[in-house]
């Protein structure tokens, strides 16, 4: 697709999305486009600080949990003494960026709105970790907390997975992994998926959308994939191309959120249509005027706050 044939996205987004796009952080250096991945991770963490300000205060604890790959950092958010369920959160960032700090506000709001314990898992990033290491770390953390639930004062009889972007893929992949391998970590009551990628290699939205404003050009998406996967055969794995998994049975209830001007939107639409066609419990909601990654901007965007509330409400309705 010639770039000039794409939609003029920045002219079409909502007023509040434009405010976010035009928000300058004067102390921020330029994005290190030609820098190392370590420099890009450092920049991403620095840039997200502004957007994480003002999140709800609550009891928070940091723990390292064992996996076969080594210890993985986790952060537990306790919004209240009662513990109706535990929700595991997987951050986005194209598998190569992001951490518990970059998504701290998202997790705090999700805990506040659901009144459930939220556990963020700081899975090892790519390319240092290759598929399926991140999923195996997430599953290992889930199993660990299931076995040690009383020690951490959490309710692991009912759990959920949630994530944005690449984290959404990891959330659903982890739930399917537990189902397929018959691993008991408690009942998976729901999965919350904000603008994820689920295995499409091409689509209308991938052609019409994506640019420097969202880091989701065709070249960007290829780079993330090459960093994450171990080999070409992994592209067809049912835990990477989730459409190659069995989506006709025992899929936990899924809340699927789409951003209107996201090149990955068709992934969400196809996931919803597939699940709905096979009577799997699911809900799809499109957030008008939004770009990919809008969930970060709840400090300025009512729509981002609404999307988090919608996901929390969906999850608690399953309990």
Curated annotation (Swiss-Prot):
Its EC number is 3.1.1.-. It comes from the Bacteria. A motif (Involved in the stabilization of the negatively charged intermediate by the formation of the oxyanion hole) lies at residues 91-93. Keywords: Cytoplasm, Hydrolase, Serine esterase. It is found in: Cytoplasm. GO terms for cellular component: cytoplasm. GO terms for molecular function: carboxylic ester hydrolase activity. The active site is at residues 165, 262, 292. The keyword Ligase does not apply. Belongs to the 'GDXG' lipolytic enzyme family. Homodimer. Interacts with MalT and MelA. Displays esterase activity towards short chain fatty esters (acyl chain length of up to 8 carbons). Able to hydrolyze triacetylglycerol (triacetin) and tributyrylglycerol (tributyrin), but not trioleylglycerol (triolein) or cholesterol oleate. Negatively regulates MalT activity by antagonizing maltotriose binding. Inhibits MelA galactosidase activity. This is Acetyl esterase. It comes from Escherichia coli O6:H1 (strain CFT073 / ATCC 700928 / UPEC). The gene is aes.
